Structure formats: C-alpha cells, structure tokens
C-alpha cells in the first residue's frame, strides 16, 4: 500500500491491508524539508507501529508486523492533525 503526504496532510486517508500477516507501506513524503512519518495506533491509543521520521522529498518503505483484523487510526507523529484510517481484513 502507498500513503502520501503533501502540504502537511495525508492525501491518502483510507487504506486497506491484510490482517494477520506482515505488510509494507510505501510512504511518500512530498513536503520539501518537512519531517513526517506514519504511526499506526491500537484502539487503546498505544502504538501498533511507528515508522521512522524523515524529511521530504523522499520515500521510505516501512515493514509493518502482522496485526489482527480491525480498523486502526494512523497519524504523523510530528503533525498529529495529519490522520487517516487503516482497515485490515
């Protein structure tokens, strides 16, 4: 799956992935010299996954461990107003 950040917002706010097996996220940070990452949250607010923070313009491939089926909010650790939803089936 691909998640894109541009103008301090995720342009991809709804993504689907596989439940119960590891998957990858290609995270494209299109904001010049601006730090972003993707952080996936559990229902209790704790981190299910926290990707490396890096400055754009660049792309990182995140290796996400297996997570149970469900809906997970994701955000940028640096800019918490950047949000989206990951659905694992």
Regions found by a protein language model. Name each.
Residues 1-89:
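Extracytoplasmic copper-binding redox domains, predominantly the cupredoxin/blue-copper superfamily
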